């Protein structure tokens, strides 16, 4: 696969990556009553609770390889309801407004607002998809002895070392005072940083100005697009999707938006990392790369392949081998064939 084709495929899936942020719905899976959490689990849970329950406003940088993008986030919690505004400061303007589980994605260049229910996956400074105990089944947790400094705040270093090669490792730094996640680094099997997100300026607590929750854009007259999401059982439709060790299925939906062809989506998670599979009709005006194969942008690896009349995209924050394994596991047997 040529470098140009690889780059084109990665770029063509950027919308899907953004869809994971603003257009993906999931309810948290029902979990059995868990035993009392360990001290490490409580520390990870504190990070998650801080992201949801604290008032904070700041600018963070997201680095993937040689590229970097900055964003501004403002989050407030009144004891019952969350409100959040996230604004991309580089590249094409893009803004996310959230009130509890509803997310609006503002696209000023198209004068459009995309509306959908929030995904189960929290973005930075959130951390986990599932509970801390689920995460610890697949990662060894170690706590650093010395504090570090991020955004002019002391933070505690926590390292999550994967127990197998199917997932990345992580090095976190959580605010020693509030528990808020200040930096997360994604680590390769060689312990190299392949991606990181870190605050570069931050306010926490009463100093947060709630006026910063207001959108920059006047959206009167903008087109509002609501994505229709319907639960679907892909096995009943003839699809088989393999799950890497430790990953489990947390989402299966068919999504419809405007007059575009329906897209089926499966989301797998180990409690921290997530892998999404998108299944859409091949052709019919859809733009797909001329070549299949893997591509990468930072820690996010992506594999695209054609399967009969469908195009399959698998992407997620997992090593290339894991993403390729999922892509290779996907098969389809039409209903007529399965009856014989």
What would you call each of these model-derived segments?
Residues 3-17:
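Bacterial N-terminal signal peptides that target proteins for export
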Residues 17-26:
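Bacterial N-terminal signal peptides
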Residues 28-32:
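Sec/Tat signal peptide C-region and signal peptidase I cleavage site
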Residues 33-111, 137-186:
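N-terminal mature ectodomain segment of secretory-pathway/periplasmic proteins
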Residues 105-127:
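Acidic/charged, solvent-exposed loop-and-adjacent secondary-structure segments enriched in E/D, K/R, S/T
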Residues 129-187, 192, 221-266:
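Extended beta-strand-rich segments in extracellular/periplasmic secretory proteins, especially
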Residues 178-180, 187, 191-210, 312-340:
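Surface-exposed amphipathic alpha-helical segments
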Residues 220-308, 320-321, 325:
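Short, solvent-exposed recognition patches
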């Amino acid at each position: 696969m040529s470098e140009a084709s690889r780059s084109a495929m990665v770029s063509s899936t950027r919308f899907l990556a953004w869809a994971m942020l603003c257009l993906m719905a999931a309810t948290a899976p029902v979990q059995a009553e868990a035993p009392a959490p360990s001290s490490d689990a409580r520390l990870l849970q504190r990070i998650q609770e801080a992201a949801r329950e604290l008032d904070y406003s700041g600018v963070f940088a997201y680095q993937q390889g040689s590229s970097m993008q900055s964003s501004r986030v403002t989050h407030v919690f009144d004891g019952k309801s969350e409100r959040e505004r996230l604004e991309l400061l580089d590249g094409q303007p893009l803004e996310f407004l959230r009130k509890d589980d509803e997310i609006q994605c503002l696209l000023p260049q198209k004068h459009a607002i995309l509306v959908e229910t929030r995904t189960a996956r929290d973005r930075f400074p959130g951390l986990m998809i599932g509970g801390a105990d689920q995460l610890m089944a697949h990662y060894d947790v170690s706590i650093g002895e010395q504090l570090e400094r991020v955004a002019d705040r002391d933070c505690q270093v926590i390292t999550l070392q994967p127990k197998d090669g199917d997932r990345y490792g992580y090095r976190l730094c959580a605010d020693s005072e509030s528990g808020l996640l200040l930096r997360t680094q994604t680590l390769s099997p060689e312990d190299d940083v392949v991606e990181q997100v870190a605050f570069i300026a931050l306010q926490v607590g009463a100093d947060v100005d709630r006026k910063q929750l207001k959108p920059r854009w006047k959206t009167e007259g903008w087109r509002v697009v609501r994505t229709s999401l319907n639960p679907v059982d892909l096995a009943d439709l003839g699809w088989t999707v393999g799950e890497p060790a430790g990953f489990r299925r947390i989402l299966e939906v068919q999504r419809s938006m405007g007059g575009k062809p329906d897209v089926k989506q499966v989301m797998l998670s180990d409690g921290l990392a997530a892998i999404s599979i998108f299944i859409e009709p091949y052709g019919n005006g859809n733009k797909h790369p001329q070549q299949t194969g893997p591509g990468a942008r930072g820690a996010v690896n992506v594999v695209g392949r054609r399967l009969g009349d469908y195009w399959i995209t698998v992407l997620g924050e997992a090593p290339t081998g894991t993403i390729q394994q999922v892509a290779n596991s996907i098969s389809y047997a039409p209903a007529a064939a399965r009856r014989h």
